[in-house]
A protein has these predicted regions:
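Extracellular glycan-modifying ectodomains
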Residues: 30-31, 68-69, 83
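C-terminal substrate/ligand-recognition segments
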Residues: 34-70
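Short, hydrophobic/amphipathic alpha-helical packing segments
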Residues: 43-50, 86-94
Length: 160
């Protein structure tokens, strides 16, 4: 709790239950939405998580490193069409807006990463960025999500 109260904690929604030997993981049903890294897609966590932090600690907060990995690629038109990322962000930001309207003092939101980068867990395999990086050449291509997110930022969420 102390690290959370200092703004250093992560809030994740995990499904656990009490077993005879203590907490145990609950398998999600087949078809449960997940990212390319097999992390659950649970937009509601950006509604209840900030509200919980607000109710418990009464502190302003920033949301950092929210995003997902996708199997991004350059299409024949030379662009990166990452509709999964746009859908993910729209769902999460809608829920964050609900949390703010319910009283969470969220001062800012930061997408996981501007650029595709080296992920400590999986190297260059996962792509989290709003901008595609061709690691061989260093070339950068803004993904569709970069343009979408730019519009969201310019309208303070009004375009979601």
């Amino acid at each position: 709790d102390r690290s959370v109260s200092r703004g250093l904690g992560d809030v994740y929604k995990r499904q656990v239950q009490m077993g005879t030997n203590g907490p145990c993981y609950v398998e999600r049903p087949a078809g449960y939405a997940h990212t390319a890294m097999n992390w659950p897609v649970e937009p509601e966590s950006l509604n209840w998580g900030p509200r919980y932090i607000q109710e418990r600690y009464g502190l302003p907060m920033f949301i950092a490193e929210n995003g997902l990995s996708c199997t991004d690629k350059i299409y024949r038109d030379g662009k990166v069409h990452d509709v999964e990322r746009i859908d993910f962000l729209a769902r999460y930001l809608e829920k964050l807006s609900e949390g703010i309207q319910a009283g969470a003092d969220v001062r800012g939101y930061f997408h996981w990463s501007l650029l595709d980068n080296y992920e400590w867990h999986s190297g260059y395999r996962e792509r989290f960025g709003l901008v595609y990086v061709d690691y061989a050449s260093g070339r950068r291509i803004p993904k569709d999500s970069a343009f979408w997110y730019g519009e969201v930022a310019a309208t303070n969420g009004g375009s979601i």
